[in-house]
Amino acid sequence: MGSGEPNPAGKKKKYLKAALYVGDLDPDVTEDMLYKKFRPAGPLRFTRICRDPVTRSPLGYGYVNFRFPADAEWALNTMNFDLINGKPFRLMWSQPDDRLRKSGVGNIFIKNLDKSIDNRALFYLFSAFGNILSCKVVCDDNGSKGYAYVHFDSLAAANRAIWHMNGVRLNNRQVYVGRFKFPEERAAEVRTRDRATFTNVFVKNIGDDIDDEKLKELFCEYGPTESVKVIRDASGKSKGFGFVRYETHEAAQKAVLDLHGKSIDGKVLYVGRAQKKIERLAELRRRFERLRLKEKSRPPGVPIYIKNLDETINDEKLKEEFSSFGSISRAKVMMEVGQGKGFGVVCFSSFEEATKAVDEMNGRVVGSKPLHVTLGQARRRC
């Protein structure tokens, strides 16, 4: 329980502007220590150290609620980065409504900071441009990691800071200051950039007789290549896919446009921009999330669909092929008059298992045919 007078629930809004967030606290700091530290600034209603709900260990931050907003403002302006237990703490206005923080409006990102610039220096460097809701130099055990975030209470203040500070030299280092971007936005920009510059091409559903030389012959007409490789298993057998790296993006793009969907020796090629595994998994996750949001409730199972099944594959064999990726609740080959129709479904217990199966099994030859494996639409019953 915090020190001082408790905050009556019915009067919460009245004291909203008199509450301060206190961050970067030493684990040994208590409510009483906070109370004694801030009491000289003015009458307090209560102090609170936030703790883990299970272990009750302190989380490194807390709140100080003053009786009067003027006292809270005085403390914010004069006590920020003071010491408790030998460690400087950060102060900012308490923001119970986190919509502004989550919106990203007014938030900026700073990188290439000198290690000597701490939270205090950052605050005073940027406070000239507007009211700061929060500022934080990101650190690890070795100190500053060279980047930071400053959140202003308005977009105009953030734009002023970017205009005046981007490219400025601080302690002989030229800093970058720009608008904060959420991870999803940064990833989208990387994807857009990669699509406009890629030189590495992924090719799948190639025949067993296609080796590096034959693959090069097929792709070299579009431009000079740096490397061509058919991927093989431990026994030397082709896995049915490979990579072609061109010297220029234009050649790679032309090859994709011309060869994707083309039939070679009865096999329809897939030709596209080569993606890193983490990018493929992220794309699968995004697609799954879009499908999941269409459902009213979370389904108990995650289906994947398999096409181009060999005629010899039955339910048992299908489950066996996919069992290494996780817990399977259902594996079914679609039948017609006792004959497999060439496609089936496998239901996993989690999205992670299903995603891994798609990533590893799509294009793999099982029996005599390369599989076409995709995430299915989540349903109430799998």
From Swiss-Prot:
* Gene3D superfamilies in alphabetical order: 3.30.70.330
Q: Name one Pfam family in it.
A: RRM_1
InterPro entries listed in its UniProt record:
Nucleotide-bd_a/b_plait_sf, PABP_1234, PABP_RRM1, RBD_domain_sf, RRM2_I_PABPs, RRM_dom, RRM_dom_euk
Principal place of residence: cytoplasm
Q: Which UniProt keywords apply?
A: Cytoplasm, Repeat, RNA-binding
Query: Its Gene Ontology molecular function terms?
Result: mRNA 3'-UTR binding; poly(A) binding; poly(U) RNA binding
Which cell locations does it reside in? Cytoplasm
Do you know which PROSITE patterns this protein is assigned to? RRM
Query: What GO CC annotations are associated with the protein?
Result: cytoplasmic stress granule; cytosol; nucleus; ribonucleoprotein complex
Q: Report the coiled-coil segments.
A: none
| Domain spans labelled RRM | 18-96, 106-182, 199-276, 302-378
Task: Describe the function of this protein.
Answer: Binds the poly(A) tail of mRNA. May be involved in cytoplasmic regulatory processes of mRNA metabolism. Can probably bind to cytoplasmic RNA sequences other than poly(A) in vivo.
What name does the UniProt record give this protein? Polyadenylate-binding protein 5
Specify the species: Macaca mulatta
